[in-house]
């Protein structure tokens, strides 16, 4: 048509898409048709209701993560869930799920995500006496591309009331692999935080090489400083008032701790035991089955910021790809990985979350009852 008419290709396409729109040049009519008529393309639906019904439980098992993260691990998760007979897929549905894109996942799950549609407060108090002995991180001795350099932070479970003692969670995040360990303590006393850090060190699948903390007194103290010197662990701190210096662990404070246990107040020994029982399952679920996208580059062009992330991978996958992780450690990680069922871990986590919520509900009922009894005239109304 382009050769016959001499039209530009895209001009000809526009005329044809208009389905005969009248174009007049002088007394001649080049193209005449019904302007109101439009040719509607009808594409068959590839990912139908059968695919969605199987995708939804997998998405729930994976903690409702975004399509990009889910697509990266979906083939592996399907294989594991079929191994433990958590799901049954027909050949056609299985083929479609293995080929589905991240965008299609988000589109299919958009309505479900809307159905499931407070922020924490910092309780950090500065520790000043030892600041001059603990260097601010300058990245000269800090190697973020090697496993073992971690950021640490505390997450308070005060429920909006910072009076008295309440449970705290020590969050330890490896910068290179994003491997995360958590442990709850009864309060922010240095002795409990120090013991929790030593306990977490025994669970890390790699040697602890460096620690970076904020300026809280629970970290800036002689116990931790002397321990790091004795164990030859690099100990650095962020700049005062610059929370983004610990951006990796700050992200995990929400995505791991807050998403799992919420913002309620936990201050009893029973709740402390429940928190740590939950964290035992959560560390396996998060580190082996939750893909993470790491920021590769960030470019600003005027008011626009363009961010580039790497391919989503779990902390376990990142460790297995690292050349500096020994074959012995990789073998141990692989042996643990093949025994894990993400659906079972998710059920156990959900059960422990429900128990935690029950303790909170009981306390609220008791507080309401106490408040009512303390009101003037309550005895008269009761009689």
What are these model-derived regions, one by one?
Residues 2-210, 215-243, 248-383:
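Secondary-structure boundary/capping micro-motif
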């Amino acid at each position: 048509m382009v050769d016959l008419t001499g039209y530009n290709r895209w001009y000809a396409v526009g005329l044809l898409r208009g389905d005969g729109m009248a174009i007049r040049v002088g007394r001649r009519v080049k193209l005449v048709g019904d302007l109101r008529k439009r040719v509607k393309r009808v594409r068959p639906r590839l990912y139908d209701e059968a695919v969605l019904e199987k995708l939804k439980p997998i998405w729930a098992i994976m903690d409702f993560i975004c399509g990009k993260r889910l697509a990266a691990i979906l083939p592996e998760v399907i294989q594991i869930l079929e191994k433990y007979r958590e799901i049954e897929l027909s050949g056609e549905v299985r083929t479609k799920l293995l080929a589905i894109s991240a965008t299609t996942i988000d589109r299919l799950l958009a309505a479900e995500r809307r159905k499931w549609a407070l922020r924490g407060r910092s309780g950090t108090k500065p520790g000043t006496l030892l600041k001059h002995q603990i260097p601010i991180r300058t990245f000269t001795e800090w190697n973020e591309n090697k496993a073992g350099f971690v950021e640490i932070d505390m997450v308070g479970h005060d429920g909006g009331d910072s009076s008295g003692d309440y449970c705290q969670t020590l969050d330890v995040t490896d910068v290179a692999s994003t491997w995360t360990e958590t442990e709850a303590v009864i309060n922010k006393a240095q002795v409990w935080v120090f013991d929790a850090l030593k306990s977490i060190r025994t669970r890390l699948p790699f040697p602890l090489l460096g620690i970076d903390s904020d300026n809280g007194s629970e970290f800036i103290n002689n116990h931790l400083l002397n321990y790091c010197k004795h164990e030859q662990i690099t100990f650095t701190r962020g700049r005062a008032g610059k929370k983004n210096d610990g951006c990796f662990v700050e992200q995990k404070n929400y995505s791991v701790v807050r998403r799992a246990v919420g913002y309620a107040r936990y201050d009893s020994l029973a709740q402390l035991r429940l928190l740590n029982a939950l964290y035992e399952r959560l560390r396996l679920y998060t580190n082996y089955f939750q893909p993470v996208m790491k920021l590769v580059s960030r470019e600003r062009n005027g008011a626009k910021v363009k961010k580039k992330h790497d391919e989503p991978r779990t902390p376990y996958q990142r460790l297995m790809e690292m050349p500096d992780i020994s074959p012995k450690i990789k073998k141990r990680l692989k042996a643990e990985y093949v025994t894990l069922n993400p659906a079972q871990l998710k059920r156990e986590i959900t059960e422990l979350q429900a128990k935690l919520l029950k303790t909170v509900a009981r306390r609220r009922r008791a507080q309401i009852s106490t408040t009512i009894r303390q009101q003037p005239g309550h005895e008269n109304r009761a009689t």
